[in-house]
Amino acid sequence: MLSHLKEKYHLDKVSANYLRSNKSYIKLYRNKVVEIRFSEENIDSLDDFLPFADTLKEIILYKCNLSDLSNLKYFKQLRVLGFNRCSFSNIEIFKNFTNLPKLKELVLNGREITYLNIFSNSIESLSISETSIKTLIDINIPNLKSLSMTRNPIKAIDALFPKLRELYITAGNFDLYSLKYTPNLRDLYAYDCIKNQSFDGAAVCTKLKYLQLYGEPFTNFLPFVKLNSLEILDLQESEIESLEGLEQMHNLKVLELFGNPIQKINSIKPIQHLKQFGIERHKVSPYMRRQMKKNDIIFIYCWI
């Protein structure tokens, strides 16, 4: 069975545990196939993989042409499944996606994917970034902990994810008030924000601790003053010019401001409640560094 795969996909044995080509590989454990990662292959069906259905834990396909996924239901030992920028001759499988009882991580990336109807009690991590999916309404994954849905048309959370802790979104025009459907959200990563966008809606997440807005168009802290539970804010490579509003964020403990146009930190007052502050060293005077030390603020700096 394995010899057929070696011949068809031009795989060479490079060690006791790996068969590899220039773009793809198969991993073995105790002479059993446990992982398949194929790139830019033409895969007529999953029939070639069926002899290993009882041992396969991970299948990742990248830029592959896929014709028939009907046998996916037989891979009941899978923990990780990924279709990254693949081409599908038939996308009907996404209208009633196979329930794989041990699957923990599902990655579906590609503009051809327009819809997803799935029920799973096992999946904990889902990525549907860079798809054409517009709604989450038919995604029923009650134990989901991490969701990535950047660069797609989704503008709101319209399904309940009671255990979700980590979320990646394209924030421009996203309805942040819809985060009420993620009551246990802890970490939010937001990309492609619009200028002067308010994050008031995210205040519905009363357990939100971490917010990353790397390289976004914010000039001060007023958009975040209602995030009372926030403890860590990462605004690196953004457009922060002043600390206005920061003094209102009483529970904030860690702030990262590397790569922002703000010139100098002239007062201890806006940052005195922080435990850790990251910024270029030349923007903090020796006097301010002494004040930070007096307030037990850990100064994380770079020399640039």
Which role fits each region the language model picked out?
Residues I26, F199-D200:
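Periodic aromatic/glycine/histidine/acidic cluster detector
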Residues I36-I43, I60-L66, Q77-N90, K102-T114, ...:
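Concave beta-strand-loop units of leucine-rich repeat
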Residues M1-R20, N117, I137, D158, ...:
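Positively charged, hydrophobic/aromatic-enriched amphipathic segments
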Residues L5-R85:
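LRR N-terminal entry segment and analogous cap-like coil->beta motifs
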